[in-house]
């Protein structure tokens, strides 16, 4: 018993000594985590070089765009063919994908050989052979009469210019077909099919095996955004942000990058890591100086590395008693499969002996232990190097997404990964050690790259179908020049109807006289109070106008909230609240009890009977205070002031915000004769000739007309321009059938239009993978400020996703692009409609004055105009386009409509004083 224990101990010690001896000898092949992180850092730099326009030509790691812009989302369906060519055999596959709530893939495939003489013959022979095999396969399945889409996996270095156009850079893996390098392989295969003439197919996509692997796994796991192959060769691909890919135009979305990482180190960046054995392998290879990283890690070279180490150690008399056999000296005799077999056993001694004896050697126990250890070191180094480069890719994706922790899946294929007993486990452990901030899942691709090519094709078909469906919906919101001219024409007709005594009562565009007959002339002076009520907040202002235009205007103001219960209570409660706030403001300014002239900006539809008498026609913007509609708001305000008995005010003028805006800008620019607001609501005013204002007596001079253009279309005159989404938003609003034009252009409604379109797209499976979240069903979540943020040019899709996440909408990159597109279309239409209305106004002023050309300024205010990144520009372009005889300038009103009310009061006081004199 003791003897056997001693013997076991002796062998263990012997084994241990032998292992240590090999470890020392191969010290440079054993890489620490520190070294691996350094390699990872270098690889990151190489990736950036490959992506940059200026550095790409000289970069070793080519980072080739694949034009694959999306991974599967599980809704793909249809029948597809795939060709998988990447070695001496190639496969033809028929893939049927069904999506009836259960993702299901059916496959038929057949393997065809490529004879050596065809591999080395002409390109025509090669592609004719492929077409023949394809015909044979389609015959068997009896599908020759169908024109099916085909995906082509072509695993050779290519320069891809489109999804279905790929130029072979150079043959590898023993292929030498003449006349193919530098040519588009898709065109060559199409020609071969045409030469036969007995079937037709639609070649949609050409991809390499790495991309195929990512797509195959992406169908089962939607987090899969990296593809890895470690087999005869090695390569990886991953989804990169378009904004970083300089070789392809466009910044939106993502694209899969075929890294061609086998060439890492070809520029010398791994020279300190490569050993004498790596150099020897390279010198004896078919492509010296090329694919140096691949030669350190892939199955084609691993066995050869072990053989070279065994030879050198034998020559130095460290193994086999210094004896060599002819077989051991023969290149390629030690195969990668042998490494897997030897490492597959616990101690590997029996298998090592078998392999070494096959090579004509007579190994001792120590020789077998050493061989086992050499295999371990070579395969572990391979897994570690793979892990280092993968860590760089994961780190990059994590930074691209700006996530604290990245959840990502890597789709993997290749004989080394699948067949080596420990490679996968070592790779996983090392990756997780090197990037602790990532939760990485490795998913084996079971059906290889052929199914992946079919998936790329299926995704391309899905994207094209979905794109067509979305465009069909969105085209109703995209207005042509002629359509916009028609909107302008109709607006002019409605303006006429509102101004005319006969038609005014039934006209939706009310064209209300404001009794403001002059703009500032610069001689106004004095202290004025202004009230500005037009939304859930209102302002009280003290405006000090110094004599002369350059004396300027000094302003003090305070903002007060109007609680919802007051908005929806009685009129007395609302006006008592307003007076309470005025009292607070006067006290705050140290002016308690002072009597001042007051201008009141009241931004609701009113019928004005004089400058200081204005009858509220109807509440808008969510107000519902009872007992106000049909009443004079100045009287309601005065009554509330008397109820308080604390101060008295001289209410000189009541105006709406649009007029206030025109007056504010008129103080700066004498050409300003139009006011426009595009914010929560929308409206416009302008200086009309008195002779046309039939509701007011007098023919001389001009008067500002408050158009109340939000109601344009309430008589059905815009019905052919309204979409189902406009109708839905209108029906669910507080005032169905009213303010239809406003509901197509103003900030209060654009987000709702977008939300309704997104719901429609989701129901039809064109967005958010067809899943409608409860959040998306919630009215009002899509605030217009989000539209402004989403469309901001400096915002990457990443931030768009963050906004959508904040709204509780889990979105992919593709979803973010679609949401952004919808926002763009809706906001653009709003700006164009607004521009068409404005063109009608300025053209009317020009025609009123009988001018060939008019120079006019529009004073503008409102959050949509000011904050949306493109609204103003699109609107300006539209006005220029539709009213070419008018030179229109736009002046932003900086101090809002409150200052305008004070200026109107100042002008009125000036005119009143002049009259008294």
UniProtKB/Swiss-Prot annotation:
What is the taxonomic lineage of the source species? Eukaryota, Metazoa, Chordata, Craniata, Vertebrata
Annotated region (Hexokinase large subdomain 1) at 208-447
Q: Where in the cell is it found?
A: Mitochondrion outer membrane; Cytoplasm, Cytosol
Job of this protein:
Catalyzes the phosphorylation of hexose, such as D-glucose and D-fructose, to hexose 6-phosphate (D-glucose 6-phosphate and D-fructose 6-phosphate, respectively). Mediates the initial step of glycolysis by catalyzing phosphorylation of D-glucose to D-glucose 6-phosphate. Plays a key role in maintaining the integrity of the outer mitochondrial membrane by preventing the release of apoptogenic molecules from the intermembrane space and subsequent apoptosis.
Protein name, as recorded: Hexokinase-2
Question: Where does the chain bind D-glucose 6-phosphate 1?
Answer: 84-88, 209, 232, 413-415, 449
Outcome when changing residue 209 to A: Decreased hexokinase activity
Family designation: Belongs to the hexokinase family.
Please name the pathway. Carbohydrate metabolism; hexose metabolism; Carbohydrate degradation; glycolysis; D-glyceraldehyde 3-phosphate and glycerone phosphate from D-glucose: step 1/4
What is said about the domains? Answer: The N- and C-terminal halves of the protein contain a hexokinase domain. In contrast to hexokinase-1 and -3 (HK1 and HK3, respectively), both hexokinase domains display catalytic activity. The region connecting the two hexokinase domains is required for the catalytic activity of the N-terminal hexokinase domain. The N-terminal half regulates stability of the whole enzyme.
Q: Which residues bind D-glucose 1?
A: 155-156, 172-173, 208-209, 235, 260, 291-294
Give the species this sequence originates from: Homo sapiens (Human)
**Which processes are annotated in GO (biological process)?**
apoptotic mitochondrial changes; canonical glycolysis; cellular response to leukemia inhibitory factor; establishment of protein localization to mitochondrion; fructose 6-phosphate metabolic process; glucose 6-phosphate metabolic process; glucose metabolic process; glycolytic process
What EC number(s) has UniProt assigned to this enzyme? 2.7.1.1
Q: Where does ATP 1 bind?
A: 30, 84-89, 425-426
Q: Which residues carry this modification: N-acetylmethionine?
A: 1
């Amino acid at each position: 018993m003791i003897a056997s224990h001693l013997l076991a101990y002796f062998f263990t010690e012997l084994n241990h000594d032998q292992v240590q001896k090999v470890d020392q000898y191969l010290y440079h092949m054993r890489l620490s985590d520190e070294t691996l992180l350094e390699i990872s850092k270098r690889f990151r730099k190489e990736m950036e070089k490959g992506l940059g326009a200026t550095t790409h030509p000289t970069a070793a790691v080519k980072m080739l765009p694949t034009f694959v812009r999306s991974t599967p989302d599980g809704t793909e369906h249809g029948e597809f063919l795939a060709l998988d060519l990447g070695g001496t055999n190639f496969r033809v596959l028929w893939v049927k994908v069904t999506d009836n709530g259960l993702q299901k893939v059916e496959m038929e495939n057949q393997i065809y050989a490529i004879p050596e003489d065809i591999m080395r013959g002409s390109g025509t022979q090669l592609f004719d052979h492929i077409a023949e095999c394809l015909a044979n396969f389609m015959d068997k399945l009896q599908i020759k009469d169908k024109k099916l889409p085909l995906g082509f996996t072509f695993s050779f270095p290519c320069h891809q210019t489109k999804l279905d156009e790929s130029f072979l850079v150079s043959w590898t893996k023993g292929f030498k077909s003449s006349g193919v390098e530098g040519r588009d392989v898709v065109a060559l295969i199409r020609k071969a099919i045409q030469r036969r003439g007995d079937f037709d197919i639609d070649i949609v996509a050409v991809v390499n095996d790495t991309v195929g692997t990512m797509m195959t796994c992406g169908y089962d796991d939607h987090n899969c955004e990296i593809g890895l192959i470690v087999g005869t060769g090695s390569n990886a691909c991953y989804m990169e942000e378009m904004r970083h890919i300089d070789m392809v135009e466009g910044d939106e979305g993502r694209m899969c990058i075929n890294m061609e990482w086998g060439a890492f180190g070809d520029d010398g960046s791994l020279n300190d890591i490569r050993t004498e054995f790596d150099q020897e392998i390279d010198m004896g290879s078919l492509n010296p100086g090329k694919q140096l990283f691949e030669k350190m890690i892939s199955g084609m070279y691993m066995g050869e590395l072990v053989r070279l180490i065994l030879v050198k150690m034998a020559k130095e008399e460290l193994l086999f008693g210094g004896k060599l056999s002819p077989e051991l000296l023969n290149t390629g005799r030690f195969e990668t499969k042998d490494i897997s077999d030897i490492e597959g056993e616990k101690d590997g001694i029996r298998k090592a002996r078998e392999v070494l004896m096959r090579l004509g050697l007579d190994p001792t126990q120590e020789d077998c232990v050493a061989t086992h250890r050499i295999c371990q070191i070579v395969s572990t180094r391979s897994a570690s190097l793979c892990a280092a480069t993968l860590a760089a890719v994961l780190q990059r994706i994590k930074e691209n997404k700006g996530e604290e922790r990245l959840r990502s899946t890597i789709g993997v294929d290749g004989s080394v990964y699948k067949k080596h007993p420990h490679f996968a486990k070592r790779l996983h452990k090392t990756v997780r050690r090197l990037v602790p901030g990532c939760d990485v899942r490795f998913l084996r691709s079971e059906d290889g790259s052929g199914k992946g090519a079919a998936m790329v094709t299926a995704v391309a078909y899905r994207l094209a179908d979905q794109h067509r469906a979305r465009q069909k919906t969105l085209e109703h919101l995209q207005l042509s020049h002629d359509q916009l001219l028609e909107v302008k024409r109709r607006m002019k007709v409605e303006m006429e109807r509102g101004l005319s005594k006969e038609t005014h009562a039934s006209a939706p565009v009310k064209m209300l006289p404001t009794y403001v007959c002059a703009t500032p002339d610069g001689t106004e002076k004095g202290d004025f109070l202004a009230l500005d009520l037009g939304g859930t907040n209102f302002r009280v202002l003290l405006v000090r106008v110094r004599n002369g235009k350059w004396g300027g205007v000094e302003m003090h103001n305070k903002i007060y909230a109007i609680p919802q219960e007051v908005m929806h209570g009685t009129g007395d409660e609302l006006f008592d609240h307003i007076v309470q706030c005025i009292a607070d403001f006067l006290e705050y300014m140290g002016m308690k009890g002072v009597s001042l002239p007051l201008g009141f900006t009241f931004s609701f539809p009113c019928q004005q009977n004089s400058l200081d008498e204005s009858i509220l026609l109807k509440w808008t913007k969510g107000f519902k205070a009872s007992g106000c509609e049909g009443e004079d708001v100045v009287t309601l305000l005065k009554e509330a002031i008397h109820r308080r008995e604390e101060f008295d005010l001289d209410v000189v003028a009541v105006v709406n915000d649009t007029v206030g805006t025109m007056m504010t800008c008129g103080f700066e620019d004498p050409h300003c004769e139009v006011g426009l607001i595009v914010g929560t609501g929308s409206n416009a005013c302008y200086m009309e000739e008195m002779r046309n204002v039939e509701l007011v007596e007098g023919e001389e001079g001009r008067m500002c007309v408050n158009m109340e253009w939000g109601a344009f279309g309430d008589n059905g005159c815009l019905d052919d321009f309204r979409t189902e989404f406009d109708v839905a938003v209108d029906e669910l609003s507080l005032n169905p059938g009213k303010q239809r034009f406003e509901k197509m252009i103003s900030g209060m409604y654009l987000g709702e239009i977008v939300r309704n379109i997104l719901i429609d797209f989701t129901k039809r499976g064109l967005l958010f993978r067809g899943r409608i979240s409860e959040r998306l069903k919630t009215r009002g979540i899509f605030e217009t400020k989000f539209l402004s943020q989403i469309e901001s040019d400096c915002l990457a899709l990443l931030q768009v996703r963050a906004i959508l996440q904040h709204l509780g909408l889990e979105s992919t990159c593709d979803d973010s692009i679609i949401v952004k597109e919808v926002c763009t279309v809706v906001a653009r239409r709003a700006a164009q409609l607004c521009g068409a209305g404005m063109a009608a106004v300025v053209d009317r002023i020009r025609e009123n004055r009988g001018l060939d050309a008019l120079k006019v300024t529009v004073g503008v205010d409102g959050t949509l105009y000011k904050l949306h990144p493109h609204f103003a520009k699109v609107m300006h372009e539209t006005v220029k386009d539709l009213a070419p005889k008018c030179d229109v300038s736009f002046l932003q009103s900086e101090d809002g409509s409150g200052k305008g009310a004070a200026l109107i009061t100042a002008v009125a006081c000036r005119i009143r004083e002049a009259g008294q004199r």
